[in-house]
Structures are given as C-alpha cells and as structure tokens.
Amino acid sequence: MTEQTDVDVVIVGAGPAGLTLANILGLEGVRVLVVDERDKLIDYPRGVGLDDESLRTFQAIGLVDRVLPHTVPNQILRFFDAKRNLLAEMAPPDARFGWPKRNGFVQPMVDAELFGGLQRFDNVEVRFGHRMHQCTQTTDRVEVEFDGGQASVSARYVVGCDGGRSVTRRLMGVSFDGTTSSTRWLVVDIANDPLGHPNSEVGADPRRPYVSIAIAHGIRRFEFMIHPDETDEEADDPAFVRRMLGQLIPYPERVDMIRHRVYTHHSRIAGSFREGRLMLAGDAAHLMPVWQGQGYNSGIRDAANLGWKLAAVVTGRAGEELLDTYDVERRKHARAMIDLSTMVGRVISPTNRKVAALRDRVIHAASAVPSLKRYVLEMRFKPMPRYQQGAVLHHAHAAPNSPTGTLFIQPRVDTRDTQNALLDDVLGTGFAVVCWSNNLRAVLGEEAFGRWKALGAKFVEVRPMSQLRWPGHDDPDVAVIGDRTGALKAWFDVHTESVLFVRPDRCIAAACIAQRAPEISEGLFAALHLTSGAHLTQGGGTDGEKPDRAVLHVAQPAAESSGTGAGTS
C-alpha cells in the first residue's frame, strides 16, 4: 500500500490507542494509514499499568500472548503513611474479565508488539515522519495534508490519536477543558531494579510524597514530588536525583538510570470526541493524573469502543449514525476516570502535616470496617462502563438490575473440542448472541437468526458441564459451551435475562428473557443502525459474507492461554 493515497481511515499518531485501533480495523479488512510525526515509536515508558480490560482487548486482536511476557500480573499496590504504616492495599483477587485487574508493564515493548501486529495485514500501512498540518472535510471524504510537500491522502474518516498537544483536536476546533496541576513531579526510570520486589507502593509522606513502581524486566520507576521552591533545573541535576533516590535505596550512585524528567498532571477532556468525519481517541481526547494508572487504559478503551463501530460503518454493516454513540458512551466514563484519578491524587499528596494526619486517622478507622477494606482492596471504586445511552437498547420490559450496557464476564469454558478456553475465544471478534441452555434458533426465530448470521455474529449456547455433550439442540450454526467453573451459571443466577446480544467490544447491547428475543433483536438493529447484511464497500465480499480481512497471518490464542487472568496514548 506504499503508493496508496485513498484509504478508509487515517489514524494520526502511532501510540497505543492508534496502534490498537489500527489492529482492530486491520482485522476487519478496513484500509488504514497510520501516520506519525516522529521517526519511530517512542522508546521510553510513559504508562506503567495495564488493566484487565486492556488485556482483553489485546486478546481480541490476537496479540495478548505477545504482550504478556512484558507484564507483571496481579501487582499489589500499597499506600504507606510517613511512618511506613500501611494505609491501604489494592490487590483485587478476581479476574472476571479473564485477566488480572492490575499489571505492571513495559510500555515501549508492548507498543512494539502492537506495531508488529500490523505486519499481519496488507491493508494497513504506517508512515513515520509525517506531520499532518491540515485536513479538510467534504461531503464524503477528508483530505489530509502533511508538512514538507509529502503526498496528501484522501480518507473517509480521520482519527486523531496524537496526544495531549493534538493537531487533530486543534483542526477540529474543539476545546480541551480542565486544569493543569501546579504540582510538579520528578520521574526516574531505573534498570536492574535496586529493590527487586514485584509490587508497587505510594508513600503518602507530607514531607515529600513518592511513588515506587515495579514495571517489568527489572525496570523500576520512582516518582518524587518537587517542592514549590525547587526549580525544574535543580530537579534535573543528577545530584538532586541521587538525593531523592537516597531516601529509598542505600546506594543511589550505583543505579543504572534509564532517564529522568519533570512533569505535571493534567485533568482535561475534549469538548467533543467527534466532529463530522474527524474523531479523537487516547490522550488527544482526555488527560488524567497518573494515580490510578488509567491514562493508557482509557486510550485502549477508546480504541475498542470506536474500532468496531468504524469497521461496521466502513464495511456497510451499519449507518453512520452509529459513530455518534462513541462520544455518548466514552465521554462519561473518561470523565469519571479523570475525577477519580484527581481525587486520589489529592488524598495521597497533601503537604500540610495536619491534613495528612487527619487523612491517616480517617483511613485507618475505615480500614477497621471489613466492607470498606474490601472495597479498596478489590478496587470496587474503579468506575466501570454502564451505558444508559448509545449503542444499547434499554427496553420497557428490562429488569431493574438489567446487565444491558455493562461488560460481559469472561470465564474459562469447555467446548466439545477444547478445554479451558477463554470465553471470548469462542465468541469471536464480532457480535455474539448468547443464551443459557436453550434452542437459540427457535428462541430468535429464523428471521432474526438469519439477520445476525448475515452480520457474521456467533451464536453460543451456555450449558452446565453435565449437558455439554447432549445432542438435543445441536445446530451447525450454534456453538455449545460447558460452564466449567460455574461462573456463567452464577452470573445468570442474579439476572432475569437469559438471552444476551453482545457487541464486539464485549459490552452487552441488549438482554431479555427468551420469549422476547425476536422483538428485542429487531429493536436492537434499529438502535444500532445495523443493516440486514454486510453490503460491503470493499474487500470482495457479498451480502451475508464476512468482509475480506486481507490478513497475511493472524496469530490465534492457544486453547490454554499463557495468561492467568490483570499512561499515555
């Protein structure tokens, strides 16, 4: 595609959000051009924490087994007061989405795996050394121009994943509302970890708050608050850096320093994530403090949410109105993450000793209450997507605790051919219709069943293990899975709904009892602006076929994954 100047999607920025989005679109046969003003990928870590949702997305694009070697799963985060008394601990035990909730990771190595994944596709190209300076929308295209007289490109859509100083956002003319903290931090990355333990800690010491994070591969990050009377130049001095390190390690002069720099925290969100054919994702759309490690992960969520929608529109499986749901769904959740990260930062880093002492007393008192202690330990405070509007259907007959708009769980299951598979590996990468132990074709009716089949949806019947090999409902179009851990039975135990319409990003788009499935299916097609079949605009497919993915090679997860369950973009 070297000479290609006419593509479906231009992605501006080869960071994690842009690379993940390119992989999602590449799998769907969408013609993608990724451009970046740099000459190569950034080779130093910015984000240091991966969550379960990001790993689930990497699983969906077939790259999780390449990413896992660069992670520290199930990483514990401990908060200490000035006397090193434990204030709180975060060690979430469950892996309801298939992966650990907290993982340290080496961002440059993970980003390199995302970049390497694009080599599987002959419909995706990356061009470094291309700085976009103009993009002009017409009725059905966007004309993209670059500095230095480089050839312009015509695309149907442009997605700006070009960071906090986004050129795309500026060209869209949208605001970047929020605040920038006056507090500065010194970040120091060190090879050959001088501490060597696998976990991370925050020192909530009012004299000088600090952070110590185990990344992976023997890399550790230290962060120290810089006092107002200390200049950036002073903080950049190697002697100052060694003095800071000397608070935590015995021989700071012996460390193998990778880099150090001064930074500030931003809490900002774009006024709009979409203007016509231009969209924003990752840091271009939102910036947040580092305290919850959600900057990187929020960019991956953007890519997962936007990717399937763009692919559906470009390949003719949905109307353009579906793209309106991107801002509707992602804005509220990104805002919640920004607010949480900002609040945690305020709790961690007061420099007034009386305020810090009061905080410590409150936290110690709260820790004596088991339910509050579990709330923190299991990270139940983390905002989870629950879409009330967007690409979902909340119908009049839904139960009060309807799962619609939430992420479906991902336990391990058995099929008749494999054991201990992650659920998403059975559901595939597109839509899925899932039911509990029922005849799915009869439940949906032939018309609805045929419409979902034309969109490439997978049909999955969940059964108790005792019924896995019973042939009574066998249908060549329906996969039968056994609930090997009981997690799916437990999930259905607390929900009235037994039929689920699951989106490609694993959000439940609609849920209902079996008898209402045909009408809910029809309503969902309208709500998501889906077509009756895949009327492809490229790729050589015909109605009822999946698009030609133009895949050179797609690595498939093994039946037994190497995973054991858990920024910047």
UniProtKB/Swiss-Prot annotation:
E.C. number(s) listed in UniProt: 1.14.13.127
Residues reported in the UniProt entry to bind FAD: 8-37, 273-283
Keyword NAD: yes
Catalytic activity of the protein: 3-(3-hydroxyphenyl)propanoate + NADH + O2 + H(+) = 3-(2,3-dihydroxyphenyl)propanoate + NAD(+) + H2O; (2E)-3-(3-hydroxyphenyl)prop-2-enoate + NADH + O2 + H(+) = (2E)-3-(2,3-dihydroxyphenyl)prop-2-enoate + NAD(+) + H2O
Biological process, per Gene Ontology: 3-(3-hydroxy)phenylpropionate catabolic process; 3-phenylpropionate catabolic process
Principal EC category: oxidoreductase
Keyword line: Aromatic hydrocarbons catabolism, FAD, Flavoprotein, NAD, Oxidoreductase
Pathway membership, UniProt: Aromatic compound metabolism; 3-phenylpropanoate degradation
Parts forming coiled coils: none
Domain of life: Bacteria
Gene Ontology molecular function terms on file: 3-(3-hydroxyphenyl)propionate hydroxylase activity; FAD binding
Cofactor requirements of the protein: FAD
UniProt keyword annotation of Flavoprotein present: yes
InterPro entries: 3-HPP/3HCI_hydroxylase, FAD-bd, FAD/NAD-bd_sf, PheA/TfdB_FAD_monoxygenase
Protein family membership: Belongs to the PheA/TfdB FAD monooxygenase family.
Primary role: Catalyzes the insertion of one atom of molecular oxygen into position 2 of the phenyl ring of 3-(3-hydroxyphenyl)propionate (3-HPP) and hydroxycinnamic acid (3HCI).
HAMAP family: MhpA
Protein name: 3-(3-hydroxy-phenyl)propionate/3-hydroxycinnamic acid hydroxylase
Organism annotation: Mycolicibacterium gilvum (strain PYR-GCK) (Mycobacterium gilvum (strain PYR-GCK))
Organism lineage string: Bacteria, Bacillati, Actinomycetota, Actinomycetes, Mycobacteriales
